[in-house]
Swiss-Prot record:
Annotated NCBIfam families: PRK04203.1
Name of the protein this chain belongs to: Large ribosomal subunit protein uL1
Membership in a protein family: Belongs to the universal ribosomal protein uL1 family.
Organism: Pyrobaculum arsenaticum (strain DSM 13514 / JCM 11321 / PZ6)
GO molecular function: rRNA binding; structural constituent of ribosome; tRNA binding
Gene: rpl1
Gene3D superfamilies linked to this entry: 3.30.190.20, 3.40.50.790
Its job: Binds directly to 23S rRNA. Probably involved in E site tRNA release. Protein L1 is also a translational repressor protein, it controls the translation of its operon by binding to its mRNA.
Subunit structure: Part of the 50S ribosomal subunit.
A GO CC term attached to the entry: large ribosomal subunit
InterPro entries registered for this protein in UniProt: Ribosomal_uL1, Ribosomal_uL1-like, Ribosomal_uL1/biogenesis, Ribosomal_uL1_3-a/b-sand, Ribosomal_uL1_arc, Ribosomal_uL1_CS
HAMAP family given in the database record: Ribosomal_uL1_A
Top-level taxon: Archaea
Keywords: Repressor, Ribonucleoprotein, Ribosomal protein, RNA-binding, rRNA-binding, Translation regulation, tRNA-binding
Length: 222
């Protein structure tokens, strides 16, 4: 079910967040923080881990493929940023520092089904808690379409606290595009948890800027 959101309030708060804080020597991201209430996180179904494709991604995500054989060829043709072979996966075994570095280096990973047991054993303990486990691409699925979708996607995740943090824009980006990204994320959250029931508050902020608070009553149209 769709939810009506007050676009004027969101637009005003986006503008306020972009103006707030000191100038930095780098292009800051615009972040959306959604705080939910009365959510029972002892229930596994409430600890979500979703991918949401943004209409206007602030940057193209970096994608790496764990690959071999035909899948390696298809991943290269799809334009992934890096190929990690079976031998390279096995060489990572026990090297926690290298695995952590790899997890930070790329936004998303893809892999064929037959490599998942090895990946679960080698990188799973570090990738899993970080939400970086590879997206499994079955043999009958077009690798290029998966890569293109991941380039535009953000991860919407709830683990131990009822809080979702997502990058929805960047300094210099059209504010209408940032608004469209925020609305897309909120609609996706609403599919899982009714915002009218569970939303407590929202914050919009730059990477190094102060959070601009939006109360649920302000953003939920009546």
């Amino acid at each position: 079910m769709s939810v009506l959101l007050n676009r004027d309030v969101l637009t005003s708060k986006i503008a306020e967040a972009l103006k707030a804080g000191k100038p930095r020597r780098f292009r800051q991201s615009v972040e959306l923080i959604v705080v939910l209430r009365e959510l029972d996180l002892s229930k596994p179904e409430n600890r979500i881990n979703l991918l949401v494709e943004l209409p206007h991604p602030p940057k193209a995500n970096k994608i790496a493929a764990f690959a071999h054989g035909v899948f390696e060829v298809n991943a290269k043709n799809a334009g992934v940023d890096a190929i990690i072979t079976r031998d390279q996966i096995e060489s990572l075994s026990g090297n926690k520092r290298a695995i952590r570095k790899l997890a930070k280096q790329y936004d998303f990973f893809i892999a064929p089904p037959d490599l998942m047991p090895l990946l679960g054993r080698v990188v799973g303990p570090i990738f899993g808690p970080r939400g970086k486990m590879p997206e499994v691409v079955p043999p009958n699925v077009d690798v290029k379409s998966v890569v293109e979708r991941l380039r535009r996607s953000v991860r919407v995740r709830i683990r131990n606290e009822p809080v979702i943090k997502v990058r929805v824009g960047a300094e210099g980006q059209d504010q209408k595009e940032i608004l469209a990204n925020i609305l897309t994320v909120l609609e996706e959250i609403n599919r899982k948890f009714s915002l009218k029931q569970y939303l407590k508050e929202i914050y919009v902020k730059k990477t190094m800027g102060p959070p601009i608070k939006i109360r649920a009553v302000e953003v939920l149209s009546r």
